[in-house]
Amino acid sequence: CKMSEQGLNAQMKAQIVDLHNXARQGVANGQ
């Protein structure tokens, strides 16, 4: 179960990073 938990955490972190990157790009483009 630990492996599956780590996999889910990795996916969640990847999604959060993508959201932050998009937000940063949006702010950079806006400015």
From Swiss-Prot:
Instruction: Tell me the superkingdom of the source.
Output: Eukaryota
The record's subcellular location field reads: Secreted
- Disulfide bond recorded as keyword: yes
GO cellular component terms?
A: extracellular region
Q: What remark does the entry add?
A: Shows similarity with the venom allergen 5 from wasps. This similarity may explain why patients with allergies to centipede venom also display allergic reaction to wasp, honey bee and/or yellow jacket venom.
- Which family does the entry's similarity section mention? Belongs to the CRISP family. Venom allergen 5-like subfamily.
Designated name of the protein: Scolopendra 20566.01 Da toxin
